[in-house]
Curated annotation (Swiss-Prot):
This is Large ribosomal subunit protein uL30. It comes from the Bacteria. One of its GO terms (molecular function) is structural constituent of ribosome. The gene is rpmD. Keywords: Ribonucleoprotein, Ribosomal protein. NCBIfam families: rpmD_bact (TIGR01308). One of its GO terms (cellular component) is cytosolic large ribosomal subunit.
């Protein structure tokens, strides 16, 4: 059974953002603008995405 994944892309810079938000981007594996990672769709990942929703784009 395949697990559902999400494609998360960083759309804005982390410069000048709250330290916790910068750490959340790092936790998601995002390093720079337009960097895309595929992550499993879990409640923990969804919570991290919700925290930095204004800096990322999510595709199913």
């Amino acid at each position: 059974m395949a697990t559902k994944t999400l494609k998360v892309t960083q759309t804005k810079s982390s410069i000048g953002r709250l330290p916790k938000h910068r750490a959340t981007l790092t936790g998601l594996g995002l390093r720079r603008i337009n960097h895309t990672v595929e992550l499993e769709d879990t409640p923990a990942v969804r919570g991290m995405i919700n925290k930095v929703y204004y800096m990322v784009k999510v595709e199913d």
